[in-house]
Every structure is written in structure tokens, then in C-alpha cells.
């Protein structure tokens, strides 16, 4: 770089431009890769900067077009994807609908055969139907005890080889009340309703709602031979019990000793190889309505079912328990009399002598305690209801009682009105006995007044009955009871606050309206006076007790300061004769009070 060249005017202050020609090395402003100089006009046209500007403008235009096209293509692709998804969904829905229609057509053309169910209802049929199934539970009978347990798993019961009593299961004695009740249910063929929850918790197997109980009688056993014995030995034996046919094992019985030593030897061999087996019975325990109800309650103990579940449950129970429900109406005996006997009918017949129909009834019973001997016995509702306040309160919610009370109230109104009218007529007669004309006039007036009073009383009673017998009376009675209860609580609180004893049990219950404001004011004034009197008495008592306490304290303090002086001994007074005087008796409290009362009365 030349030292004379100004720094501010030199655009290339950091050195010589790169790749410059040697002729242009000294020129400070020549750009990189500069071609040789040309005509300015041509240079303007073919200038590289102008070319680059024009190319950049063209490229920018093409770029903007491609961006718009890309956005449009993306939108088209999105629309195409959405359309393809919709078409796929439509095809799937059509396939599903087609499959459903196809299956429906198959069901209509080729109906499924109904499952044949073997309905049995009596106990023998149910036992025969489930004879190859395991029983629900077992009942073992021993000499001194009984046992209830779950069924054994093996076909050959363990109790057959070991008939002694084991500890598994519920062991009961002969005198147990639970055992007696259970045996009663077994004899009746009913499931005990008290063990429904236990059966559900123990997972006992039910068969069409029934329980199959297998009974083992260990007191009456039979000799059973195993299957390894020869057939000739088994052929000579005969079964001893026809009821014990639960297992296919042979029952060996000793034959009569008529054939000699060979038979006895065979019998002894059979006895050695056989073992004792208890007699086995099967019985059925059926449910009833109470056990079904307890079963439903046990299932609904911790869950609350909806109405639909309850209805479905009830329908299934009715289907299983009341399958042969007959809804046919019985024949009318009077329309189908020709199908019945003549003695089964007793029709009324016309008696020409009495000129009336005579109805033939059966003779009344003459047993003691029957209606034919005792007659009609009036019940509680047939007794006349007395319109007392207590009974009206106790029976205030009974509609029948209100009508009877209203009737008695109406009768009492009319009776009082007639008494008032009769008393007024008697007074008028006594005053006007001087002249007959005036007496006749007063009698007519009294009768007219009596009729008017009676009519007014009847109208008032009818009005009372109409107002007290409507539907609004029910609400008014409830309102009255609530108000009476509130007033009772208020009186109780007032009595407790004022230290007044509550009303005794035999006090008269007022059925009138609540107290008026004037009565409440008088009651408050009386309570205030009683409180003042009680307060003054308490204050006087407190003052007296305070004064006594202060005087006692002062005396005690003085006594503490001074030493205690010994009192001189009292010598017994002697009489003039020299003998000691008799001791005076102390007066009792009763005599003191009796002697003090007249003086107090005289002083007052």
C-alpha cells in the first residue's frame, strides 16, 4: 500500500485485491475477477451486476409460484386423504350392515332349535334327575351325636371305612334345640330360612333352587365286600336293603348254614374281606317364599339394585317357581249346575204360608266360645268415643274418630241449646203465671225461640262438621300437633329457667288455642314476682349467713389472741332437805316448735 494515498478514499485499505491482473494491480477500486474495460453503453447492458439482478428477480418470481402451488397441492392431498378415509368408513359400515342383514336372514330362514329342558317338580323326579350329581351337604346319624358337614370328595366316603365320629363339620347332641328344629324342616322337606346366608357364604350347591341332603345312618350298617372278590362268592350273597342303591357295590349277607362246611368257610372269608358301611338315604329340601326373600335380601345386603334388575330377578324367580301358574277362571256353579250334584246347592225357596223367601243356613255352633253361644262382641272401634281432651289428642289423626268427635260435638251443641231454651221458657212461665193470655203468648214465644236455637245449633254443628271433615282439616290437625309440641317445649324451657316445677302427669291438657298476648303478659308478671320473692328470700338468707360468718370469724380471731379461760365446775344445787335436785329433761324439737307457735301467733 502507498503511503501517499489517502486512507479515507481507498476502498481497499487492507491490501491488494485477489486475482487481479498485473495491469490493474495499482488501481485501488478494481473488483475481483474484473474483465477488461469496454464501452460504457455496452458495459451497462452486459454488466454482471445487472445480469445478477435480473436473474434474482426471475428466480424470486418462480419461487413464489412454487410456494403457492405447494400449498394448493397440500390442501388437495389433505382433501383426498379425508375422502379416502370416509370411503373406507362407508365400506366398513356397509360390510357390517350386510353381515347383520345376512345373519338376520339366516336366523329367519334357519331358526335355531329350542333347547329342550326337562321340567320336573316333584321330589322323586328331581332326585332321579340329579342322581349322578354330588349332593349339597351331608347329615350323619351316630348313636349319641349328629353331624352336619360338606360332601366328601371321594366316591367311597371316608365315613364308610371309619364310622367313628370325626371333628370336621357341625356336631350336635340329641337334646339340642337347633337339631330338633332342623329335623322338623327335613321331615317337612323345606329349607330352613335361618341358614340361607350361611348356605350362600359356604358355596353350597343348589339344584333348581333345591338342596339334596344325603343322610348317613351309622347306627344301622351293612357289610360291604370289595370288588376284588370272585363272582361265585358274590352270587351266593343277597342284598339286605333295597333302599341303599346309591353305589354299585355289592351288599353281602350270610346265607343260611344248610350247605355244610364249604359255605361257612366262604362266609368267614367274606366277613374278613368286607367292611361296614352306613345306610345311605337321599332327601330333597325345597325352598319357599320366605327362603327366597331371605336369599334376595342376602344378595342385596351390600348393593342397591335398580328397578330393572329387580323386575328381571322377580320374573326369573316366578318363571322357575310358578311355572304352572293357572290363570283360568273357575266354572260358575250356577251356570254349570248340571255338572255338579244337587246336594251341593242350597237355594232360597218361596214359602206360601209366610209369603216370603226362606234362606237355608247351617245351624249355628253350640261350642263354648263361638258366636252362637257368646253372641256379638263389640270391638274397640264400635265403642262410643268419648269427646275428652286426652282422647281427642291421642286419636286426632284418625279420620273415623274425627267424624265421631264431630257428631258428639254437634250433639253437645244441640243439647246445650235445648237446655238453655228450656230454662228460659221455665223462667218466663214463672214470671207470667198471673194471666193466661200472657202465659200462652210466652209459651208460643219460648217454643219459637227453642226451635230457632235448635236450628242454629244444628247449623253450627253442620258447619263444624263441614269444616272439620275436609281435606284441609288433616293439615290443620298436623299444624295443631306441631304447635302444641312447640308450646310444650316453650313451657318446659320457661319452667327450667324460672326454677318452676313442671306440670304433673295428671294435669289437664288444654286443647284450646295458644295463649293470647294478654295471658302471656300476665304469666310473665307472675313469674317475675315469684322470681323477686325468691330472690329477696335468698338475699336475706345470704345476708344472715354472711353476718353469722363474720361474727364467728371475729370471735375466733379474738379467741386466738386471748388464752382460753377454764370454766368453773358447776356444782349440783341441793334442795333444802339436802338431797340433790332431779335433773331437768331436755325438750325435744317438736315440743319447742309447739311451744313457740302460739307466742308467734299472739305477737303477730
Curated annotation (Swiss-Prot):
GO process annotations (BP): chromatin organization; IRE1-mediated unfolded protein response; regulation of transcription by RNA polymerase II
Top-level taxon in the UniProt lineage: Eukaryota
Compositional bias per record (Low complexity), positions renumbered to this chain: 231-249, 258-272, 519-533, 547-559, 593-604
InterPro entries: Spt20, Spt20-like_SEP
Major site of localization recorded for this protein: nucleus
Record's keyword terms, sorted: Nucleus, Phosphoprotein, Transcription, Transcription regulation
GO cellular component: nucleus; SAGA complex; SLIK (SAGA-like) complex
In-chain residues carrying the UniProt-annotated modification Phosphothreonine: 516
Keyword Oxidoreductase (UniProt): no
Subcellular location: Nucleus
Additional free-text comment from the UniProt record: Present with 4150 molecules/cell in log phase SD medium.
Record note on quaternary structure: Component of the 1.8 MDa SAGA (Spt-Ada-Gcn5 acetyltransferase) complex, which is composed of 19 subunits TRA1, SPT7, TAF5, NGG1/ADA3, SGF73, SPT20/ADA5, SPT8, TAF12, TAF6, HFI1/ADA1, UBP8, GCN5, ADA2, SPT3, SGF29, TAF10, TAF9, SGF11 and SUS1.
Protein name stated in the entry: SAGA complex subunit SPT20
Species per Swiss-Prot/TrEMBL record: Saccharomyces cerevisiae (strain ATCC 204508 / S288c) (Baker's yeast)
Lineage: Eukaryota, Fungi, Dikarya, Ascomycota, Saccharomycotina
Amino acid at each position: 500500500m502507498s503511503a501517499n494515498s489517502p486512507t479515507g478514499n481507498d476502498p481497499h485499505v487492507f491490501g491488494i485485491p485477489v486475482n487481479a491482473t498485473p495491469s490493474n494491480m495499482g488501481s485501488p477500486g478494481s473488483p475481483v475477477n474484473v474483465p477488461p474495460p469496454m464501452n460504457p453503453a455496452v458495459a451497462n447492458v452486459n454488466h454482471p451486476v445487472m445480469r445478477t439482478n435480473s436473474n434474482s428477480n426471475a428466480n424470486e418470481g418462480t419461487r413464489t409460484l412454487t410456494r403457492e402451488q405447494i400449498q394448493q397441492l397440500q390442501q388437495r392431498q389433505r382433501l383426498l386423504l379425508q375422502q379416502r378415509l370416509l370411503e373406507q368408513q362407508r365400506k366398513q359400515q356397509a360390510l357390517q350392515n350386510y353381515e347383520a342383514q345376512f345373519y338376520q336372514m339366516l336366523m329367519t330362514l334357519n331358526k335355531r332349535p329350542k333347547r329342550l329342558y326337562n321340567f320336573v317338580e316333584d321330589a322323586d323326579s328331581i332326585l332321579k334327575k340329579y342322581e349322578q350329581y354330588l349332593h349339597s351337604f351331608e347329615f350323619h346319624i351316630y348313636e349319641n351325636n349328629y353331624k352336619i358337614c360338606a360332601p366328601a370328595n371321594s366316591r367311597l366316603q371316608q365315613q364308610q371305612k371309619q364310622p367313628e365320629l370325626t371333628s370336621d363339620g357341625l356336631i350336635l347332641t340329641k337334646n339340642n334345640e337347633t337339631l330338633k328344629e332342623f329335623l322338623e324342616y327335613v321331615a317337612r322337606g323345606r329349607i330352613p330360612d335361618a341358614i340361607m346366608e350361611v348356605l350362600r357364604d359356604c358355596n353350597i350347591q343348589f339344584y333348581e333352587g333345591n338342596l339334596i341332603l344325603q343322610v348317613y345312618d351309622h347306627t344301622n350298617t351293612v357289610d360291604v365286600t370289595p370288588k376284588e372278590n370272585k363272582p361265585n362268592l358274590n352270587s351266593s350273597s343277597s342284598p339286605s336293603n333295597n333302599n341303599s342303591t346309591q353305589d354299585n357295590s355289592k351288599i353281602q349277607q350270610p346265607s343260611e348254614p344248610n350247605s355244610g362246611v364249604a359255605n361257612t368257610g366262604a362266609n368267614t372269608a367274606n366277613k374278613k374281606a368286607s367292611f361296614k358301611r352306613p345306610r345311605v338315604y337321599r332327601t330333597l329340601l325345597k325352598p319357599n317364599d320366605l327362603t327366597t326373600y331371605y336369599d334376595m335380601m342376602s344378595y342385596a345386603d351390600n348393593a342397591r339394585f335398580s328397578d330393572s334388575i329387580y323386575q328381571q330377578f322377580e320374573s326369573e324367580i316366578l318363571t322357575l317357581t310358578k311355572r304352572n301358574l293357572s290363570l283360568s277362571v273357575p266354572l260358575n256353579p250356577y251356570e254349570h249346575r248340571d255338572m255338579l250334584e244337587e246336594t251341593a246347592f242350597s237355594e232360597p225357596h218361596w214359602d206360601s204360608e209366610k209369603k216370603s223367601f226362606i234362606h237355608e243356613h247351617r245351624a249355628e255352633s253350640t261350642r263354648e266360645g263361638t258366636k252362637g253361644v257368646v253372641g256379638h262382641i263389640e270391638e274397640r272401634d264400635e265403642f262410643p268415643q268419648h269427646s275428652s281432651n286426652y282422647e281427642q289428642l291421642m286419636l286426632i289423626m284418625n279420620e273415623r274418630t274425627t267424624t265421631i268427635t264431630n257428631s258428639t260435638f254437634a250433639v253437645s251443641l244441640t243439647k246445650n241449646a235445648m237446655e238453655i231454651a228450656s230454662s228460659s221458657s221455665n223462667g218466663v212461665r214463672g214470671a207470667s203465671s198471673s194471666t193466661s193470655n200472657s202465659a200462652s203468648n210466652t209459651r208460643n214465644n219460648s217454643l219459637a225461640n227453642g226451635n230457632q236455637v235448635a236450628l242454629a245449633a244444628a247449623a253450627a254443628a253442620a258447619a263444624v262438621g263441614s269444616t272439620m271433615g275436609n281435606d284441609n282439616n288433616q293439615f290443620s290437625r298436623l299444624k295443631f300437633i306441631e304447635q302444641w309440641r312447640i308450646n310444650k317445649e316453650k313451657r318446659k324451657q320457661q319452667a327450667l329457667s324460672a326454677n318452676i316445677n313442671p306440670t304433673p302427669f295428671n294435669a289437664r291438657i288444654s286443647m284450646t288455642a295458644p295463649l293470647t298476648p294478654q295471658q302471656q303478659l300476665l304469666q310473665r308478671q307472675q313469674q317475675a314476682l315469684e322470681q323477686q320473692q325468691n330472690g329477696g328470700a335468698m338475699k336475706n338468707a345470704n345476708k344472715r349467713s354472711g353476718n353469722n360468718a363474720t361474727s364467728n370469724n371475729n370471735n375466733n380471731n379474738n379467741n386466738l389472741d386471748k388464752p382460753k379461760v377454764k370454766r368453773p365446775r358447776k356444782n349440783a344445787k341441793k334442795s333444802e332437805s339436802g338431797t340433790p335436785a332431779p335433773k331437768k329433761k331436755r325438750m325435744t324439737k317438736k315440743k319447742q316448735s309447739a311451744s313457740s307457735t302460739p307466742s308467734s301467733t299472739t305477737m303477730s
